[in-house]
Amino acid sequence: MAVLIENLSYTYPDGRNAIKNINAHFEKGKKTAVVGLNGSGKSTLLYHLNGTILPQTGRVNILGEEVSKKTLNSVRKKSGFLFDYPDHQLFLTSVYEDIGFGLKNLGMGRGEIEAAVDRILKKLNIEHLKDYSPYQLSLGQKKICAIAGVLVMEPEIIVCDEPFSGLDSKVKAAFKAILDDFSKEGKTIIFSTHDQDFCYEWADNVYVMNEGELIAGGDAVSIFNNAEVLQRAGIVMPKLARLFGHKNPAPRSVEDALNLL
């Protein structure tokens, strides 16, 4: 088990109950999506999965370690977080410095940091961006540089809040390829999204949130063919599920669907 959540609730200082009594588990090596409308509690839930927010009530366990103030450094080595807005994690004078920032905080030596940063720049094919200020980059470039700063830490889990929002199709494909490579290494991906078509094709498992509550969870095909759950959450059924959900097995991609015709 990568992540276990038990009876997790969180109330913001303004009195808003963001999430209420959440119980969930995220399987190791799987891609799990968290879906729901804006304000349903997705981001607040994800913020708990690397200690960005600490539990008020309930427990969060990351790869066998309970999240608390004392375990934050250890937890964040295991679970990296990618914010919806990359400006939240790109704030130094150059891309190179930003990518190495987390390693520096861990007390790693300069030579080790430089070697690790050089490796990830080459792996993601962004060596040409290393001397740029983050403020000179496009949104897509910022997102890829931000995930480089996560991957350089070599976490077992990546938590992504709306990783594809605002990206054009070309950058989205490049970003998906990065996550695919991470997944092929047997690592765990947990992400929120409003793109139900992509989620239906790519996610292994799905959790559905509505008004701070977790109302359903299961494999992607089962969840996205459950009209009652989708209606309650205000989610539109993915096109492939709407057209071919009655098939067994149901096609998960356009290519698979074309093979049925």
From Swiss-Prot:
Q: What is its EC number?
A: 7.-.-.-
Superkingdom: Bacteria
**What InterPro entries does this protein map onto?**
AAA+_ATPase, ABC_transporter-like_ATP-bd, ABC_transpr_CbiO/EcfA_su, ECF_ABC_transporter_ATP-bd, P-loop_NTPase
- Enzyme class, one word? translocase
Pfam families according to UniProt: ABC_tran
Offer a single GO CC term for the protein.
Answer: ATP-binding cassette (ABC) transporter complex
Q: Which UniProt keywords apply?
A: ATP-binding, Cell inner membrane, Cell membrane, Membrane, Nucleotide-binding, Translocase, Transport
Q: Which residues of the sequence carry a binding annotation for ATP?
A: 36-43
Q: CDD domains annotated for this entry?
A: ABC_cobalt_CbiO_domain1
Give the membrane topology: Peripheral membrane protein
One GO MF term: ATPase-coupled transmembrane transporter activity
Task: State its location(s).
Answer: Cell inner membrane
Q: Which residues form the ABC transporter domain?
A: 3-236
Q: Which Gene3D superfamilies match?
A: P-loop containing nucleotide triphosphate hydrolases
Against PANTHER family, the record matches this protein to: ENERGY-COUPLING FACTOR TRANSPORTER ATP-BINDING PROTEIN ECFA1, HEAVY METAL TRANSPORTER
Name the family.
Belongs to the ABC transporter superfamily.
Function field: Probably part of an ABC transporter complex. Responsible for energy coupling to the transport system.
- Its protein name is Putative ABC transporter ATP-binding protein TDE_2132
**Organism expressing this protein natively:** Treponema denticola (strain ATCC 35405 / DSM 14222 / CIP 103919 / JCM 8153 / KCTC 15104)
